Design a protein with these regions (language model features):
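Residue-level signal for mature regions of secreted extracellular proteins and peptides
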Residues: 80, 103, 128, 212, ...
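Extracytoplasmic low-complexity, Pro/Thr/Ser/Ala/Gly-rich segments
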Residues: 15-90, 97, 133-188, 239-244
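Contiguous hydrophobic, core-forming segments of folded domains
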Residues: 104-143
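Extracellularly exposed regions in secreted/surface proteins, prominently low-complexity, repeat-rich
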Residues: 199-244
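Extracytoplasmic
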Residues: 108-110, 191-193, 217
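Short, cysteine-centered beta-strand-loop-beta hairpins and adjacent loop/turn segments enriched
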Residues: 90-107, 201-216
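A short, structured loop/turn motif at beta-sheet edges
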Residues: 78-82, 114-122, 187-192, 224-228
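Hydrophobic membrane-insertion alpha-helices, especially the h-region
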Residues: 1-13
């Protein structure tokens, strides 16, 4: 009798822990959805302010969206006048101990946010959750931009800050055009500021959405400040842009 009671209690504990973990996982997911919607609401307010101030260029508005969402891929459909931001969000939670483990875990969700301004009205947003695979390219772009920033921070150009020079730094092998992860569009130095515009691409080699046949790409404007006091290299800033 006792073994049967113990066995029943054991399986009840397993069921209860599983039920609690499902609840915590769903709670983490719901928090991500709330975060995505809150970010979209903040962005709409910022877009309205930018438009009211006369700053309505596509690159400016892209920067506003990026500032309030941190989304690595932001596209603009000029015909429909719609900005679309694709990005991954993640949240940690703690699972109850079970037969096969427990402890810290993470949920990830892919969100697509669209921003449109109708004639005579303000900006509006729509947030949609997509399959995690839809954010593969966005995740790859985000990782690649970090690489470009680090490469620019370590770039010693001996005052020859050129497009070809940065292209060699980012692509020393010289890949074929279709396979290039990075295409340097321009490098301009004004005083101690070096500004580069780089097209960052997921061609599918990184396992992102490009592996399904579509190339995901995003232009970024990167800036490095030279000659910092004490020889300290200032972090390179990177902001997505539409015009490349």
């Amino acid at each position: 009798m006792i073994p049967a009671v113990l066995l029943a209690y054991f399986w009840y504990s397993v069921w209860q822990a599983g039920h609690e973990n499902d609840r915590r996982r769903q709670e983490a997911h719901d928090s991500l959805l709330r975060q995505a919607r809150a970010a979209a609401d903040r962005t709409v307010g910022a877009l309205d302010e930018s438009a009211a101030g006369g700053n309505g260029g596509a690159d400016v508005l892209t920067g506003v969206i990026w500032e309030h969402t941190g989304t690595p891929v932001i596209s603009y459909d000029e015909e429909r006048r719609v900005f679309t931001a694709v990005g991954l969000r993640s949240a940690e939670y703690t699972e109850e101990m079970q037969l096969f483990g427990g402890g810290p875990d993470m949920v990830q969700r892919c969100f697509v946010s669209s921003y449109v301004r109708r004639p005579g009205a303000g900006w509006t947003s729509t947030v949609t959750e997509r399959d995690i695979e839809a954010c593969g390219g966005s995740r790859w772009i985000e990782s690649s931009v970090r690489f470009v920033r680090k490469a620019m921070e370590g770039w010693e150009a001996d005052d020859q800050w050129t497009r070809a020079g940065l292209q060699r730094v980012l692509d020393p092998v010289g890949q074929a055009d279709d396979d290039r992860r990075f295409v340097v569009r321009s490098v301009v130095r004004r005083g101690e500021n070096v500004v580069a515009v780089v097209l960052v691409r997921d061609t599918g080699l990184g396992g992102g959405s490009g592996s399904e046949g579509a190339v995901v790409e995003q232009c970024y404007r990167l800036q490095r400040v030279l000659g910092s006091p004490g020889g300290v290299v200032e972090p390179v800033t990177a902001v997505p842009v539409v015009v490349c």
